[in-house]
A protein has these predicted regions:
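Cap/insert and terminal regions of metallo-dependent hydrolase folds
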Residues: 81, 155-254
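Active-site-proximal loop/helix segment associated with metal-binding centers of metalloenzymes
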Residues: 114-146, 154-159, 167, 171, ...
Length: 270
């Protein structure tokens, strides 16, 4: 087998990511693509997909999982409510590995550790009823020294420190923004003041998780007030001498490369 020298991680906007391992395994996480105003990629843009991982049933995270599963025939890792929804939409149940916090699974040769996530997960089924389940964050064991934490829309909580001790994620995405392009699709009374984590909470979470590199996310455009606030908090923490992960703000469509030592080789982190 010819191995690529790096693990490649591409951001599509909001919380949608692609990991291509050194062996060429393509993993899509929370693949919200076709209706994502930031994504330059659509669900039919790939030559192959080897695995999809879904954190919860929100439309901007479940995204195009149904279309991708049907088009590429790839396995899906998700919670029970997502499995039930996909089955109702015609995806074979044998194609979906249901799991929850604590139950590590190995699919398509990739180990995935679901971890606690403080959020919700619900979806309207085709028959008009609603299904709810347990939202997940997860650690993807992509390659040696590349353990990717996907936050799954969680709020901050102190047991992130325990997750760091147990699973030792090296790089991860943390949601710190509240994109108006997405909120406008679901009007409600009043105003949503923050996302699941404020920029400061997101920085603190990245420290508690012990990440080497943090990728702030849940935005459609990198020129976002919350992203700028996150980077200000990051700079202030470094100036105070706190242990902080390197931080990278990615534009949708941008790719980073991680070497076999777990270090970012492209582009340069802050």
């Amino acid at each position: 087998m010819n191995l690529h020298p790096t693990t490649r991680i591409r951001f599509f906007g909001v919380a949608a990511y692609e990991i291509v391992t050194r062996a060429g395994v393509r993993i899509l996480m929370d693949p919200f693509l076709d209706e994502n105003p930031g994504s330059p990629v659509r669900s039919d843009s790939f030559d192959k997909v080897d695995l999809v991982i879904v954190s919860h049933a929100a439309y901007d995270h479940l995204g195009d999982t149904e279309a991708i599963a049907k088009r590429y025939g790839c396995p899906v890792i998700a919670g029970g409510e997502v499995r039930a929804y996909l089955a109702a939409k015609g995806v074979p149940t044998t194609q979906v590995r249901a799991t929850t916090w604590g139950i590590r699974v190995k699919v398509a040769g990739v180990e995935v550790q679901p971890v606690e996530c403080h959020h919700w997960s619900q979806i309207k089924m085709p028959d008009g009823t609603f299904a709810s389940g347990v939202p997940m964050a997860f650690v993807v064991y992509a390659d040696d020294n590349v353990r990717f934490y996907h936050y799954g829309d969680t709020a901050i909580f102190s047991d992130m420190k325990l997750q760091a001790e147990l699973y030792k994620p090296t790089i991860g995405c943390i949601g710190i923004a509240n994109p108006q392009e997405i909120l406008a699709r679901n009007p409600m009374p009043g105003e949503m003041m923050t996302g699941e984590m404020s920029p400061y909470e997101g920085l603190l979470a990245s420290q508690w998780l012990g990440l080497h590199t943090v990728l702030p996310c849940h935005y459609c455009q990198a020129d976002d007030d919350d992203v700028r606030a996150f980077m200000r908090h990051h700079a202030a923490a470094k100036a105070r001498g706190e242990r902080t992960p390197d931080a990278l703000v990615l534009n949708p469509g941008e790719t980073i490369e991680v070497n076999t030592l777990g270090r970012i080789v492209s582009p340069k982190a802050a």
